[in-house]
């Protein structure tokens, strides 16, 4: 007896160990409960005696390719050993395999292979070594359900659904198909049910419906009680209640009512199936029959569990949301004709019994954006006490509420809606005298046969949440209690968004989350503005939710938000009382944070929250209190770019100086003309008073006016510079003119005071001449500068000045149109854009179809198709067709504004070479002042030592002038000339003007360069590293070739494509998705045939039966461009003339899969497959009805321009490297196609940074070219990061250069433009340096011995000419033309040669050994041929952007040869 007890104890211990692997509650295995527990439902026989650990543990072998070292072995063992159900795992590097001991009921080998594949290796089940199930026959351990999932827009949605569902307990595996909008889930039915899976997908913001499933397990009450703790979705109370309800219905007799509904909006049998499957699952629904022809549904239901109104709502809530249900007369009230034969169940008494009159109120609601808002309002308000019924219309923006006025008032209803984050106002009320019986929130009355009123609880569509009567108590509180905490707003920084689909994904999913009231995501800024209920959710939870969607999110703690500012002009104010009236009214308005009104200027500055209120609303408030308000006129944003103010200023200064300078120049010329008649000059030399001649008096008057008028701006600028303890060119000019003026004035005053016989020689002629030439130079300089920013000004000029804001009524009919200035357009406005007009804001198309010209923004030459749901960019031109768009980003948040901001910042930034010039210019002015002083002193000394030197070069010395006066005058002349000729401006303008022109020209060519540093760095690049997936290739698999192997008369190409497309439509594999997409495009249809008996074998292929393809062939929209020899006289294929329904047995897969199914593969077919596989493509075979009939080659296709771009870079002396996480074979195949002979393969993303650093440590300047998402660390590490994508990729912070168009030749163009720009900068600097190095010595008189002498006005003219010449030199960059494709092809003609595999060196992972292409061993050939190369689709995953950019479909057929699509062997 003790021995038996020990055996029983040992078996129980083993059972608990296995159960821990299953994650089942241990208490379920207590001996006291063993008699009542249904072991057969979890896959074991009843009783513990037959259960042993060995009987439930299996051992299998998995083949693994791609391991290179013991680190790979350890990483695989560590990761797989941690999986549930894995007992042990041993990996052998030498044998390339792993031995796995596992529990089959918990984990399967396919899961193990999938996990290994996610690590970057290739894994498959070894043939003949798969574990067998235990000898005892086990009940169904796994079941499969197929869900229809609506709302997925990109690969991010797929990853999000797969990631979340895979984490659920009881889910074995999940595959989501974006193209088919389906999810296939394998699950353990004793742990989770299909309804729970559907509810989880719904909770993520998608619309899910069960498409097909296996019969659920029949669990007894004890099973439910013991297993429900493992179901995270169903609380215990809910499960018990459901069980009790079912027991009541099953054993006490149900009260069935038959109801006939009219349903509009059904189009096909799919709609019928959708309604029947989903409504049939609702609590209380016994049966439902839907007729598509009669547009009716006959429902048998239990009125104690549901009601007609609840059924109506449930059907209308089904995706796609187009169903409209009409109830029969009286179905909503108490007097319904549908009667039951028994009294109502005592188990469902009415929650509330309030007799009396019910009222109806109409509430206007603003801020609703989608059906989710409608459901949120209906769900929340219907739970309030006293609310009988609520119907919300999204199109009309209203809610009709039937309520009990003795319990709740319309004002409380309005407040409750506003607490949810919407704007609400009561429009009208009406009182009804018809008593509605025992109505309460969510209940209605239906009479039975004896007239007894029976409570019919309104059950919302099943969403996995608690029924209404299980809602928390807080939902039933009064509106006063729910308004205790006001909604709050938070801002999140989001990284990883690449396209509008990502924005839509985040907004849609967040709006479905409880507590989130409104969401607005800005792609360009990478920010999200979210209004939320702090009692329900917190910002960190929102950030975590976004991270679960596949993006990086962080809460911006110190971000104040994008509060709006508006400046208004207000007329009609008379006193301070008016000011106070306006300010107090504005500050009391919700949404306005600050208001300041100035009576003197009649201006008002208002700060507001654009989420709550807009500029038009503010103007309306001011006008309502008796004043007139309008938007204050401001200078357009582009005015500072065209330098109009500066040009006007310097033009005025030049003209003033010229008016007074011309007489001065005339007198100078007159005095310099030699004359033999001395009396002609005696008139001007005659003294008016002693010491003051007529000539000096005229000079003094003219010079004084020039100093005050022409030189005023120079003096203001010099004063500002000196006040900040700095010196610039204006200081030098003011010094020169002031010294000449003051010196002349002093000696003239002294002469007058001393009553000299002759008036002294003065410098009054110098300032007018200086100001004339310097002002002329500044004027011409700013004229030239205005041209440097012409590209940016052109971008800014794209912004529309006005927008047509419309008000929509029913059926989107336009009720009113209003022309609104751009500054007054608010977020959420509906804007009408006519043909030829500009899109004023970023938005989404609501109605209409058109083509948008985005060439000036993105550089895309061809117009882009826009349809409802498409995003539009502000500044693009509507080519044809009027459209209505909803504004999503206005003002500075638009894409155009962000691009302008980026280009502005680039033009303001300094290149490294400019920083050196700036440091030199900082010391330049003090140096010139010192040189000028030294020149003055030196010439005074020389003059007194040897007067002959000075006298020889002094122009026209007057015999009446003393020797000292001549020396002093000549010394001052040379000193002032030094001040005038020195020009730091030419040094300061050399780089900025070239950078401004260069970045502007680049922007016009679709290349956004972020500043002067990358612009200068690009010409130094010696190595360019290309990412493969999404950069060199398109990033998604495509069909490259279709090869027919059978009889074309029996199986023509159209029929093969129809059959193959239908078969692969049920596959979730990326290759299957690619084949399905190709077949649909070639056949011109979106619908395919029926697929049954589908079977997928990982690593091998699929098998199924296909039928109903005749309709596709008969009704395809466009004929396939097949060769004429395969068409009959009627133009159709021979096999299509008889539309006899057929069922085809289909096999699609690799060689091994077809051999397993008894097919023989000829050597010709095998050779054809090998040819494609050697190119890195995947070749699959197709067999129909046991006959091998075709081969399909699939690959991630190389971009057309890739090889040309690589060759051009190499011809420029740049080393090109391919770096990818893909396997070596695929990487080598891609490299041979594009001509790259250096490859880094099987590199993890974190290792890409190390590879960049490795090349940088060797002294090379490295450029990294990637998609800007997965490669962002490497982009940041590289000397120049280049992100390739659409115009929205300017949000990528890691890249230095963003190519708006997805064109690799723009990489070449950016380097080419950089070389041109840097060469122009060097020319400018050389000109500026030579000018100063030569000009200053000449001005100082160093070259007097060879007869070169300069007057001060000559120096000023030369200085002005230097600045103008530098700017004009930079403007020559505007003539730059980006080399076109024809030029590149002409240069490469005859030089581009494809590489062989032996010419490509492949570097594996972080290994330091280069691996040349060896001769393939027999084993390599066999393994390469027999396996499907899929790592290109798993190791180096395509970016979300690449997938989104490819959604529009291919522009060309994917067949290699359009004229020879069908090939035969």
UniProtKB/Swiss-Prot annotation:
What does changing residue 1064 to K do?
Answer: In WD; loss of copper transport activity; loss of ATPase activity
Q: What's the protein name? A: Copper-transporting ATPase 2
Q: Which effect does the record note for changing residue 1178 to A?
A: In WD; uncertain significance
Mutation: residue 1250 to G; reported impact is: In WD; uncertain significance
Q: What is the effect of changing residue 1074 to V?
A: In WD; uncertain significance
Q: What is the effect of changing residue 382 to C?
A: In WD; uncertain significance
Q: Where do the annotations place Mg(2+) binding?
A: 1267, 1271
- Consequence recorded when altering residue 1239 to G: In WD; yeast complementation assays show that the variant does not rescue iron-uptake deficiency of yeast mutant ccc2
On whether Electron transport is a keyword of this UniProt record, the answer is no
Gene Ontology cellular component list:
Golgi apparatus; Golgi membrane; late endosome; membrane; mitochondrion; plasma membrane; trans-Golgi network membrane
- Residues engaged in binding Cu(+) 5: 499, 502
Q: What is the effect of changing residue 933 to P?
A: In WD; uncertain significance
Effect the entry attributes to changing residue 1375 to S:
In WD; uncertain significance; localized at the TGN as the wild-type under conditions of low-copper levels
Swapping residue 1273 to L leads to an effect described as: In WD; decreased copper transport activity; increased ATPase activity
The record lists the organism as Homo sapiens
User: What does the UniProt entry say about where the protein is found?
Assistant: Golgi apparatus, trans-Golgi network membrane; Late endosome
């Amino acid at each position: 007896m003790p021995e038996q007890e020990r055996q029983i104890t040992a078996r129980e211990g083993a059972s608990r160990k296995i159960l821990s692997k299953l994650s089942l509650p241990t208490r379920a295995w207590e001996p006291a409960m063993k008699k009542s527990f249904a072991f057969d439902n979890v896959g074991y026989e009843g009783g513990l005696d037959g259960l042993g650990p060995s009987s439930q543990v299996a051992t299998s072998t998995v083949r693994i390719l791609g391991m290179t070292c013991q680190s790979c072995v350890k990483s695989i063992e560590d990761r797989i050993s941690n999986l549930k159900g894995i007992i042990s795992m041993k990996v052998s590097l030498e044998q390339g395999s792993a031995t796995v001991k596992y529990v089959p009921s918990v984990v399967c080998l396919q899961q193990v292979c999938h996990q290994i594949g996610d690590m970057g290796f290739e894994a498959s089940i070894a043939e003949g070594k798969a574990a067998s199930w235990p000898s005892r026959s086990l009940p169904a351990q796994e079941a499969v359900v197929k869900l229809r999932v609506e709302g997925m827009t990109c690969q991010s949605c797929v990853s999000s659904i797969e990631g979340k569902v895979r984490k659920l307990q009881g889910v074995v595996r999940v595959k989501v198909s974006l193209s088919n909008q389906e999810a296939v889930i394998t699950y353990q039915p004793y742990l989770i049910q299909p309804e729970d899976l559907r509810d989880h997908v719904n909770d993520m913001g998608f619309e899910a419906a069960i498409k097909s499933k296996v019969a659920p397990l029949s669990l007894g009450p004890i099973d439910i009680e013991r297993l429900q703790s493992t179901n995270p979705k169903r609380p215990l109370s809910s499960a018990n209640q459901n069980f009790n309800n079912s027991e009541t219905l099953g054993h006490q007799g149900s009260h069935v009512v038959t109801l006939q509904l009219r349903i509009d909006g059904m189009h096909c049998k799919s709609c019928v199936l959708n309604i029947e499957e989903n409504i049939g699952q609702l609590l209380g629904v016994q049966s439902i029959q839907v007729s598509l022809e009669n547009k009716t549904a006959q429902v048998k239901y239990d009125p104690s569990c549901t009601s007609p109104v609840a059924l109506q709502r449930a059907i209308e809530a089904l995706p796609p949301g187009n169903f409209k249900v009409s109830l029969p007369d009286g179905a909503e009230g108490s007097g319904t004709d549908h009667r039951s034969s028994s009294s109502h169940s005592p188990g469902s008494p009415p929650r509330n019994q309030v007799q009396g009159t019910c009222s109806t109120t109409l509430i206007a609601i603003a801020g609703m954006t989608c059906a989710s808002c409608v459901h949120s309002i209906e769900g929340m308000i219907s739970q309030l006490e006293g609310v009988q019924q609520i119907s919300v219309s999204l199109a009309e923006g209203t809610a009709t509420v039937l309520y009990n006025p003795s319990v709740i008032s319309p004002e409380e209803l309005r407040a409750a809606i506003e607490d949810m984050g919407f704007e609400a106002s009561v429009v009208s009320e009406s009182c009804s005298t018809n008593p509605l019986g025992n109505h309460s929130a969510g209940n209605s009355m239906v009479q039975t046969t004896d007239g007894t009123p029976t409570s019919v609880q309104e059950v919302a569509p099943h969403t996995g949440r608690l029924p209404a009567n299980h809602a928390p108590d807080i939902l039933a509180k009064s509106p006063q209690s729910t308004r205790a905490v006001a909604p709050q707003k938070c801002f999140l920084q989001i990284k990883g968004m690449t396209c509008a689909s990502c924005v839509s994904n985040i907004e849609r999913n967040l709006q479905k989350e409880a507590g989130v009231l409104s969401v607005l995501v800005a792609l360009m800024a990478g920010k999200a503005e979210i209004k939320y209920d702090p009692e329900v959710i917190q910002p960190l939870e929102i950030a975590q939710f976004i991270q679960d969607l596949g993006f990086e999110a962080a809460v911006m703690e110190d971000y104040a938000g994008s509060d709006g500012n508006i400046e208004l002009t207000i007329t009609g104010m008379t006193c301070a009382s008016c000011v106070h009236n306006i300010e107090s009214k504005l500050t009391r308005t919700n949404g306005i944070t600050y208001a300041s009104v100035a009576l003197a200027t009649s201006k008002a500055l208002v700060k507001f929250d654009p989420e709550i209120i807009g500029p038009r609303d503010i103007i309306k408030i001011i006008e309502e209190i008796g004043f007139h308000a309008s938007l204050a006129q401001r200078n357009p944003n582009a005015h500072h770019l065209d330098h109009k103010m500066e040009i006007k200023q310097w033009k005025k200064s030049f003209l003033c100086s010229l008016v007074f300078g011309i007489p001065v120049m005339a007198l100078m010329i007159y005095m310099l003309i030699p004359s033999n008649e001395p009396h002609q000059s005696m008139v001007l030399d005659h003294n008016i008073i002693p010491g003051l001649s007529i000539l000096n008096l005229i000079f003094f008057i003219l010079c004084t006016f020039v100093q005050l008028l022409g030189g005023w701006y120079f003096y203001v600028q010099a004063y500002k510079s000196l006040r900040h303890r700095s010196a610039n060119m204006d200081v030098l000019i003011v010094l020169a003119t002031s010294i000449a003026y003051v010196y002349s004035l002093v000696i003239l005053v002294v002469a007058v005071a001393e009553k000299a016989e002759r008036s002294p020689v003065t410098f009054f002629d110098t300032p007018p001449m200086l100001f004339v030439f310097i002002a002329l130079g500044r004027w011409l300089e700013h004229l030239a500068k205005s041209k440097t920013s012409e590209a940016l000004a052109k971008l800014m000029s794209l912004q529309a000045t006005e927008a047509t804001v419309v008000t929509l009524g029913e059926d989107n009919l336009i009720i009113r149109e209003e022309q609104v200035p751009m500054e007054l357009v608010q977020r959420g406005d509906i804007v009408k854009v006519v043909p030829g007009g500009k899109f004023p804001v970023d938005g989404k198309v609501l109605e209409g179809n058109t083509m948008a010209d985005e060439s000036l923004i993105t550089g895309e030459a061809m117009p882009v198709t826009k349809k409802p749901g498409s995003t539009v960019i502000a500044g693009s031109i509507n080519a044809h067709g009027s459209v209505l768009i909803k504004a999503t980003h206005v003002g500075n948040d638009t894409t155009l504004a962000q691009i302008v901001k980026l280009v502005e910042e680039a033009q303001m930034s300094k290149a490294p070479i400019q920083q050196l010039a700036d440091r030199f210019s900082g010391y330049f002015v003090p140096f010139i002042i010192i040189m000028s002083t030294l020149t003055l002193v030196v010439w005074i000394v020389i003059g007194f030592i040897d007067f002959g030197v000075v006298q020889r070069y002094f122009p026209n010395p007057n015999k009446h002038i003393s020797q000292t006066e001549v020396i002093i005058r000549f010394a001052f002349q040379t000193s002032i000339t030094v001040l005038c000729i020195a020009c730091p401006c030419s040094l300061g303008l050399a780089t900025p003007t070239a950078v401004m022109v260069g970045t502007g020209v680049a922007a016009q060519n679709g290349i956004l360069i972020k500043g002067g540093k990358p612009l200068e760095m690009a010409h130094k690049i010696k190595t360019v590293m290309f990412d493969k997936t999404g950069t060199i290739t398109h990033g998604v698999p495509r069909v490259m070739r279709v090869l027919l192997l059978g009889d074309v008369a029996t199986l023509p190409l159209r029929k093969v494509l129809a059959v193959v497309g239908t078969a692969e439509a049920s596959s979730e594999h990326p290759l299957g998705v690619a084949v399905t997409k190709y077949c649909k495009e070639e056949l011109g249809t979106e619908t395919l045939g029926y697929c049954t008996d589908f079977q997928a074998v990982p690593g091998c292929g699929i098998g199924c039966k296909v039928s109903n393809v005749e309709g596709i062939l008969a009704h395809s929209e466009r004929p396939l461009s097949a060769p004429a020899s395969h068409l009959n006289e009627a133009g159709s294929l021979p096999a299509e003339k008889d539309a006899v329904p057929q069922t085809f047995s289909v096999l699609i897969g690799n060689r091994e899969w077809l051999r397993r199914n008894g097919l023989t593969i000829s050597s010709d077919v095998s050779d054809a497959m090998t040819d494609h596989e050697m190119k890195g493509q995947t070749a699959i075979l197709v067999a129909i009805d046991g006959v091998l009939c075709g081969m399909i080659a699939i690959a991630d296709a190389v971009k057309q321009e890739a090889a040309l771009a690589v060759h051009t870079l190499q011809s420029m002396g740049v080393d090109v490297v391919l770096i990818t996480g893909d396997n070596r074979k695929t990487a080598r195949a891609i490299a041979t196609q594009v001509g790259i002979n250096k490859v880094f393969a099987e590199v993890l993303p974190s290792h890409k940074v190390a590879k960049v650093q490795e090349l940088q440590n060797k002294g090379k300047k490295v450029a990294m070219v990637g998609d800007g998402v997965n490669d962002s660390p490497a982009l940041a590490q590289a000397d120049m990061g280049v992100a390739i994508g659409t115009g929205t990729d300017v949000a990528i912070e890691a890249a230095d250069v963003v190519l708006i168009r997805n064109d690799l030749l723009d990489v070449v163009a950016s380097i080419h433009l950089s070389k041109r720009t840097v060469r122009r900068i060097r020319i400018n600097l050389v000109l500026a340096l030579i000018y100063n190095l030569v000009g200053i010595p000449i001005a100082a008189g160093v070259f007097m011995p060879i007869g070169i002498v300069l007057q001060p006005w000559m120096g000023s003219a030369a200085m002005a000419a230097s600045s103008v010449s530098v700017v004009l030199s930079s403007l020559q960059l505007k003539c730059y033309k980006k080399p076109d494709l024809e030029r590149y092809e002409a240069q490469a003609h005859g030089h581009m040669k494809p590489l062989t595999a032996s010419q490509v060196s492949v570097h594996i992972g972080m290994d330091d050994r280069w691996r040349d292409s060896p001769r393939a061993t027999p084993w390599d050939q066999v393994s390469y041929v027999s396996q499907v190369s899929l790592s290109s689709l798993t190791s180096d995953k395509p970016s979300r952007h690449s997938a989104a950019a490819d959604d529009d479909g291919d522009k060309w057929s994917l067949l290699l040869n359009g004229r020879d699509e069908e090939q035969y062997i």
